Amino acid sequence: MSGLHKQFLKKIKEQERAFGLSSLSEDPDESESNSNYFSPTPQPPNELRTDINEERHGHIRETYNDTKRDVFPIADIYTDPRSGVRFQTYFKPPSSSNAPIFICHHGAGSSSMTFCKLAQSLDNEYGKNNEYPGLFTYDMRGHGDSSTTIPPDYSLATITNDCEFIIDEFHAKHALRSSIYLLGHSLGGSVLTSYLVANPDNAYKFKGLIVLDIVEETAIKALSAMPQFVRKRPTTFGDYQEAIDWHIKESHLLHSEESALVSVPDLLRECPNGLIWKTNLQETEPFWETWFTGLSENFINCGKTQHIAKLLVLSGHETLDTNLIIGQMQGKYQLIVFNNTQNTGHFIQEDIPTQISISLVDFVRRNDSPNEYMKKEFGFVPKWGGKIHD
């Protein structure tokens, strides 16, 4: 470990402890870190089961559909005239224009419902004058209930263009006056960062960029394990419970069954004798090398025109590259690390939605209302540039 990295770790220990979170490890195990991303323990391919528990299967389906409708009352299709791709979107409006809106982008192989429990937790944690934030999300092309092109194109440039279309369309459909925070998990964080780089002078009211559990160097190294994982993951499941059990008990991709009851069914399509994946991850392989290259530098430098605040939230002890270390020490972004490997994995928004919500609400309040935040947290509002009286 470099001296710069040690100095960095020492600096943030007190900051993270003060926030009630686990600190970065001083001697991270790089191989363990990489496994958090894309390389859960591969399992032998499943044969299609015929012993479906129809009652259990139907109950999970009903819970999934009811929860999705309750959390996201607005579910629209946005069709991009340039590509013909139909994007499934979900929107939970804020209580008023005084509450923020989170625009969320999921990662590869995931879907919008990875943010469902987070949306519920944000309502519980925001709790200011009976207000609650909004949350908008959409299924990336070829994921969830969105379509894709033939031949498929999952390059970062293309899915960034998709993101630009979605955000423009979202603003056109809704008279937005709330402050907006962009929130991306894994590949979604790279897409939103790329969007800000490509649109430095946009007129939207972006206040912050939040990236969940992605570090450029670690992600690029972890991609080497993806082909084996994609080949060896089950191709079919007998019912929803079997799929949930695989995500939690076998692959350890997820750690919360409550969240998995909504997020996992959204990944699967029912066929006559079971369930198959909606997303063909093998089709994305030719584009993997485009996804994360330059992410750290772009994250540090994007959004300067709008003075966009930035937050990086990690599930465990990642080895940060020099750009991220220097950027954090210079105060260019806030870093939060959750280091409880028994309860958290790569999908931290699903595993610990309450803790993530607390972190997001704190980030929003210090950026939306800094004077009010300082007064509440520290009992005073600093008068920068004024005289200090004894």
Swiss-Prot record:
InterPro entries: AB_hydrolase_1 (IPR000073), AB_hydrolase_fold (IPR029058), PPase_methylesterase_euk (IPR016812)
Role played: Demethylates proteins that have been reversibly carboxymethylated. Demethylates the phosphatase PP2A catalytic subunit.
Domain of life: Eukaryota
Active site: 186, 213, 346
GO MF assignments: protein C-terminal methylesterase activity
The family this protein is said to belong to: Belongs to the AB hydrolase superfamily.
Reaction catalyzed: [phosphatase 2A protein]-C-terminal L-leucine methyl ester + H2O = [phosphatase 2A protein]-C-terminal L-leucine + methanol + H(+)
UniProt source species: Debaryomyces hansenii (strain ATCC 36239 / CBS 767 / BCRC 21394 / JCM 1990 / NBRC 0083 / IGC 2968)
Keyword set, alphabetical order: Hydrolase, Serine esterase
Name of protein: Protein phosphatase methylesterase 1
Gene3D superfamilies according to UniProt: alpha/beta hydrolase (3.40.50.1820)
